[in-house]
C-alpha cells in the first residue's frame, strides 16, 4: 500500500481517533453515498478510493486501527476534501462554459488529462483497483461518449442510394421485370381460365416473388437520395419524409395491399384481385427513360419502346375481347369468339392467337372483321376504333420524328455538299479539283469528323467545356516540349483554344519562308518534311508529333525570325490540332511569368540548334515589344480623339454664340431699336411685339 506523502498531509489529521466503531464507519459510508447521489457529475476519482478504503476498514476488524488503517482513513478524508473542492469549482465554473464549446478535441483532451493527473496523485494503484470494483461508474462515465459513437456509427452505416449510379440502374432493371410481368400476364390469366388453372403453382411462386421485390423497392425508394441545390441529401429522416410526400408513395402502398386474401373467399382462379399490382407502372417508365439516356442508340430504342407499348395495347385489347365474348357467350353471333366446344377453337393457343389477330385488325384498321351485332359490341368496337386512330397517329408522328432525327446530321451534311457543288459548277471549277473536294467531304463523313465542336458545346457552361477539353486535348498538349512544365491554368486556357483541322493528301501545311501564325500537333495521319521540289522526303512525322511552336513565340534574336524553316506536306488525310499565335498571346496576357518561361525555353532550344543570334537578342532586349508599342499608340489615339471631340464641341458652341450676336445686331439695325435681344430670343420677336402694341 502506497503511503501518503507529507506534503499532502494536514496538521489536523494527527488528532484522529485510534479507535473507531462500526457505526462511525457506516455513517461515513452513508454520507459518501448521499454525496455521490446528489452530485451531478460522476466522481471517478472518489469512487475507487471509497471502495478501497471501506474494503480495508472492513478487513481490519472491529477493534482498533493499526498504523495502516490510520493511513487509509487519512487518505479517505483527503479524497473527500479534494472531491468537495472540485465540486465547488465546477459549480462556480458552470456546467457549459463558453470556451469549452469552441475548444478543440486536442485541448479538451489535454485539460481532461491534467485534471485526471491531479486527481490521481498518490492514488494511482487504488484507482486501478477501483475500476474493477466499480464497473457501474465506468459505465456512467462513458454513457455520453458511447451514445455519440453509436450515432456516428449509425450515420456511417446508413446506406443511401445514388439515383445516378450503376447500382440504382441495376435495381431498376430488377424491379422492371415484375412490373412488366404483372402488366402482361395478369390480364391474360384473368381472361383465359385455362392459363390460370393449369399453371397455378408457377403463378403463385412468381406472384409472391414479385411481391417481395415490391417490398424491397419501397425500402430502396426510402433510401434513394435526391438533389437539393445540387447536393445529394443523405439524411435518412429527410429521405423518408421526402418519399412520403410523393404520389408514388401512395401508389406503392396501394400496390402492396394484400388483396390476395380474397383468394380465401373466391378461390385462386380469380387473379384479377391482384390488379392493384399494376399501380407500380412508374418504375417501368423510369427504367425506359434511364435506358434511353444511357444507350448509344437512343432513336432505335425509342422505336423499340413505341412498338412495345403498341403490342401491350393490342394484347390487352385481345384479352378484353375474349372476356366480352365469354360474357356474351361463345358462338352466339358472328362477332364473338367461335364456340369453344369445337376442338379447333377450344385450344388455349387458338383462343389467344385468334383474339390477338382480331385486336390487331381492329386497332390498325387493316382488313375486315365481322360486324358487331349487340349494343355492347358496338360500343366496344367504337372505343377500339378511337384507340386505333390514336395509335396510328402516334406511330406516324413518332416514327417520322425519329427518322428525321436520325437523318438530321446526314441531311445537313448533304446540304453543305450540294451547295459546294452548285458553287463549283457556277464558277466552272475543274473536274480534278471538284473530285478532290468531294473526296474530302467523303473522308469527313466516313471518319465522323463533320461535327462542329463549338456548335455542339455552346450550350454547356464554361466549367464543363473546360473539363471536356482537358479530357480530350490535355495529353496531346503536354507532348509539346515548351508546354510540359506550364501552369495548370494556362494549359486549361490553351486546350480550349485548340482547333481541329483536316488536310487532304498533298496539301502543304506550311512552306519554307512563310510567316508562322500557327503551331500544329498531329492527332492522326502522317506528314512529310520535303525539299523545295516537293518530292524528296527528309523525315516523316506521325501521330503525336508537333511543329511550329517556336515561330509563334516571337523570340528575339532568332535567325529565322518567325518564319517557317521547312516545307511540310500531308501524305494522306491528316487530322491536326491547330493553336494560333493570337490565341496563345491572348492566353499569356494573364500569365506573364509563364510567357517569360516559354520564351526562355524557346531560346534554349534555338541556342541548342545554333539558330539564335545572341548579340541581336541582347540588343533587342531593351526596347519594348511591338505589342506594347501598339497598345501605347492605341491609348494615345484614344486620348487624341477625346481631345479633338472636346475642341470640336467648344468650336461649335463659339460659332453658335457668334451667330446669335450677329442676329441681334442685324435686328437692331433693321428695327432701329437700341434694345438688345435676350438670350434665346429669335430675331424678329421684338418687332412683332412692337407691332402688337401699336
Curated annotation (Swiss-Prot):
- Polar residues bias (residue ranges): 1-11, 112-123
Q: What is this protein called?
A: Cyclic nucleotide-gated channel alpha-3
Outcome of swapping residue 171 to C: In ACHM2; also found in patients with cone-rod dystrophy
Q: What is the effect of changing residue 223 to W?
A: In ACHM2; also found in patients with cone-rod dystrophy
Annotated region (Selectivity filter) at 365-368
* Effect ascribed to mutating residue 277 to C: In ACHM2; also found in patients with cone-rod dystrophy; does not form functional homomeric or heteromeric channels
Q: How does the annotation summarize its subunit structure?
A: Forms heterotetrameric channels composed of CNGA3 and CNGB3 subunits with 3:1 stoichiometry.
Activity regulation details: Inhibited by L-cis-diltiazem.
Give the residue ranges for region: Disordered. 1-24, 109-152, 662-694
UniProt catalytic activity = Ca(2+)(in) = Ca(2+)(out); Na(+)(in) = Na(+)(out); K(+)(in) = K(+)(out); NH4(+)(in) = NH4(+)(out)
Residue ranges crossing the lipid bilayer per the database entry: 171-192, 199-219, 247-266, 271-288, 299-321, 348-378, 379-403
Q: What does this protein do?
A: Pore-forming subunit of the cone cyclic nucleotide-gated channel. Mediates cone photoresponses at bright light converting transient changes in intracellular cGMP levels into electrical signals. In the dark, cGMP levels are high and keep the channel open enabling a steady inward current carried by Na(+) and Ca(2+) ions that leads to membrane depolarization and neurotransmitter release from synaptic terminals.
Residue intervals on the Cytoplasmic side:
1-170, 220-246, 289-298, 404-694
What Gene Ontology terms describe where this protein resides (cellular component)? axon initial segment; dendrite; glial cell projection; intracellular cyclic nucleotide activated cation channel complex; perikaryon; plasma membrane; transmembrane transporter complex
Residues marked Central gate (site):
392, 396
Q: What happens on changing residue 410 to W?
A: In ACHM2; cytotoxic; mutant CNGA3 channels are spontaneously open in the absence of cGMP
Superkingdom of source: Eukaryota
- C-linker: region residues: 408-485
Q: Which residues are glycosylated?
A: 339
Clinical note on disease: Achromatopsia 2: An autosomal recessive, ocular stationary disorder due to the absence of functioning cone photoreceptors in the retina. It is characterized by total colorblindness, low visual acuity, photophobia and nystagmus.
What does the record say mutating residue 563 to H does?
Answer: In ACHM2; mutant CNGA3 alone or together with the CNGB3 subunit exhibit an increase in apparent affinity for cGMP and an increase in the relative agonist efficacy of cAMP compared with cGMP; cell surface expression levels is significantly reduced
Keywords of the record, alphabetical order, are: Calcium, Calcium channel, Calcium transport, Cell membrane, cGMP, cGMP-binding, Coiled coil, Disease variant, Glycoprotein, Ion channel, Ion transport, Leber congenital amaurosis, Ligand-gated ion channel, Membrane, Nucleotide-binding, Sensory transduction, Sodium, Sodium channel, Sodium transport, Transmembrane, Transmembrane helix, Transport, Vision
GO terms classed as biological process = inorganic cation import across plasma membrane; monoatomic cation transmembrane transport; monoatomic cation transport; response to cAMP; response to magnesium ion; signal transduction; visual perception
Tissue note: Prominently expressed in retina.
Q: How does it sit in the membrane?
A: Multi-pass membrane protein
Amino acid at each position: 500500500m502506497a503511503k501518503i506523502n507529507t506534503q499532502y498531509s494536514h496538521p489536523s489529521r494527527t488528532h484522529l481517533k485510534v479507535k473507531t466503531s462500526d457505526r462511525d464507519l457506516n455513517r461515513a459510508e452513508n454520507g459518501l453515498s448521499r454525496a455521490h447521489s446528489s452530485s451531478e457529475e460522476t466522481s471517478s476519482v472518489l469512487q475507487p478510493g471509497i471502495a478501497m478504503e471501506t474494503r480495508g476498514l472492513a478487513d481490519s476488524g472491529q477493534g482498533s486501527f493499526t498504523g495502516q488503517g490510520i493511513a487509509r482513513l487519512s487518505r479517505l478524508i483527503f479524497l473527500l476534501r479534494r472531491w468537495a473542492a472540485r465540486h465547488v469549482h465546477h459549480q462556480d465554473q458552470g456546467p457549459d462554459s463558453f470556451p469549452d464549446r469552441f475548444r478543440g478535441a486536442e485541448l479538451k483532451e489535454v485539460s481532461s488529462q491534467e485534471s485526471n493527473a491531479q486527481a490521481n496523485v498518490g492514488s494511482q494503484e487504488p484507482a486501478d483497483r477501483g475500476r474493477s470494483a466499480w464497473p457501474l461508474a465506468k459505465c456512467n462515465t462513458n454513457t455520453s461518449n458511447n451514445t455519440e459513437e453509436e450515432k456516428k456509427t449509425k450515420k456511417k452505416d446508413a446506406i443511401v442510394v445514388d439515383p445516378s449510379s450503376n447500382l440504382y440502374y441495376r435495381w431498376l432493371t430488377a424491379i422492371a421485370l415484375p412490373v412488366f410481368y404483372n402488366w402482361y400476364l395478369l390480364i391474360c390469366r384473368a381472361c383465359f381460365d385455362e392459363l390460370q388453372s393449369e399453371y397455378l403453382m408457377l403463378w403463385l411462386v412468381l406472384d409472391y416473388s414479385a411481391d417481395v421485390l415490391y417490398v424491397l423497392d419501397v425500402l430502396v425508394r426510402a433510401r434513394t437520395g435526391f438533389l437539393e441545390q445540387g447536393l445529394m441529401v443523405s439524411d435518412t429522416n429527410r429521405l423518408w419524409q421526402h418519399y412520403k410526400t410523393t404520389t408514388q408513395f401512395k401508389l406503392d402502398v396501394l400496390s402492396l395491399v394484400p388483396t390476395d386474401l380474397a383468394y380465401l373467399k373466391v378461390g385462386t382462379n380469380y387473379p384479377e384481385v391482384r390488379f392493384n399490382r399494376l399501380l407500380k407502372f412508374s418504375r417501368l417508365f423510369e427504367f425506359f427513360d434511364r435506358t434511353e439516356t444511357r444507350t448509344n442508340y437512343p432513336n432505335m430504342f425509342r422505336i423499340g419502346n413505341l412498338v412495345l407499348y403498341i403490342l401491350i395495347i393490342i394484347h390487352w385489347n385481345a384479352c378484353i375481347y375474349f372476356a366480352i365474348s365469354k360474357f356474351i357467350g361463345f358462338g352466339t353471333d358472328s362477332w364473338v369468339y367461335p364456340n369453344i366446344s369445337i376442338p379447333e377453337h377450344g385450344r388455349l393457343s387458338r383462343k389467344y392467337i385468334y383474339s390477338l389477330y382480331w385486336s390487331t385488325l381492329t386497332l390498325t384498321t387493316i382488313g375486315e372483321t365481322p360486324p358487331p351485332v349487340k349494343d355492347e359490341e358496338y360500343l366496344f368496337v367504337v372505343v377500339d376504333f378511337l384507340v386505333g386512330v390514336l395509335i396510328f397517329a402516334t406511330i406516324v408522328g413518332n416514327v417520322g420524328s425519329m427518322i428525321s432525327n436520325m437523318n438530321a446530321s446526314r441531311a445537313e451534311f448533304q446540304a453543305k455538299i450540294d451547295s459546294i457543288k452548285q458553287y463549283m459548277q457556277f464558277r466552272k471549277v475543274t473536274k480534278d479539283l471538284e473530285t478532290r473536294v468531294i473526296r474530302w467531304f467523303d473522308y469527313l463523313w466516313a471518319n465522323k469528323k463533320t461535327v462542329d465542336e463549338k456548335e455542339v458545346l455552346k450550350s454547356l457552361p464554361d466549367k464543363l467545356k473546360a473539363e471536356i477539353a482537358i479530357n480530350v486535348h490535355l495529353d496531346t498538349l503536354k507532348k509539346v516540349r515548351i508546354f510540359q512544365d506550364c501552369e495548370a491554368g494556362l494549359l486549361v486556357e490553351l486546350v480550349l483554344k485548340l482547333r481541329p483541322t483536316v488536310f487532304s493528301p498533298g496539301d502543304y501545311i506550311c512552306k519554307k519562308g512563310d510567316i508562322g501564325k500557327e503551331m500544329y500537333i498531329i492527332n492522326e495521319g502522317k506528314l512529310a518534311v520535303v525539299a523545295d521540289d516537293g518530292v524528296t522526303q527528309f523525315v516523316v512525322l506521325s501521330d503525336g508529333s508537333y511543329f511550329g511552336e517556336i515561330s509563334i513565340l516571337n523570340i528575339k534574336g532568332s535567325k529565322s525570325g518567325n518564319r517557317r524553316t521547312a516545307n511540310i506536306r500531308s501524305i494522306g488525310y491528316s487530322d491536326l490540332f491547330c493553336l494560333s499565335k493570337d490565341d496563345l498571346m491572348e492566353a499569356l496576357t494573364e500569365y506573364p511569368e509563364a510567357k517569360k518561361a516559354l520564351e526562355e525555353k524557346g531560346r534554349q532550344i534555338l541556342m541548342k540548334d545554333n539558330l539564335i543570334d545572341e548579340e541581336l537578342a541582347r540588343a533587342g532586349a531593351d526596347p519594348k515589344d511591338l505589342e506594347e508599342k501598339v497598345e501605347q499608340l492605341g491609348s494615345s489615339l484614344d486620348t487624341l480623339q477625346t481631345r479633338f471631340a472636346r475642341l470640336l464641341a467648344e468650336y461649335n458652341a463659339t460659332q453658335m454664340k457668334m451667330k446669335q450676336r450677329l442676329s441681334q445686331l442685324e435686328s437692331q439695325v433693321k428695327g432701329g431699336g437700341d434694345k438688345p435681344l435676350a438670350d434665346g430670343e429669335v430675331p424678329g420677336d421684338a418687332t412683332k411685339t412692337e407691332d402688337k402694341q401699336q
